[in-house]
Amino acid sequence: MTTPSALERPADVPFVRKLGARLVLIPAVVLSLLPPRRIRRVLNVLRRGAAPATATQAKNARDAVCAVSLRCAGPRGCLPRSLGAALLCRLGGTWPTWCTGARVVPPFTAHAWIEADGHPIDEGVPDDYFTRLMAVTPVGRHPR
């Protein structure tokens, strides 16, 4: 039996940020279809020259992507959501830490998220809930 649930979409996202999110949504979805090594290669190129994103910048980008896409706002949209948020940050001249990994407690499921200042952005779980398998950090920084 399934339980219906409503998705929460951020409502207070400015129009300009929503426009930027719509702009990066198609590239994010296309990127999400690539194998992990290609995603990493593309993101490594895109992150060059960007400053590390603050938690506020990363959250604003994530909120904007969730506001314009029900798929990204949903429970199975983590990969395009995290890619879209990273690309939107890049449009603003910053780069969050983009991560993929798995939950550390059963059932072990794959997940993708963004981090800033060493903390997952708006995931609603403790910092150690996921373990990183791959990360694309801002240039000059190394993963934990």
Protein language model annotation of sequence segments:
Residues 1-144:
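Helix-boundary/low-complexity linker signature
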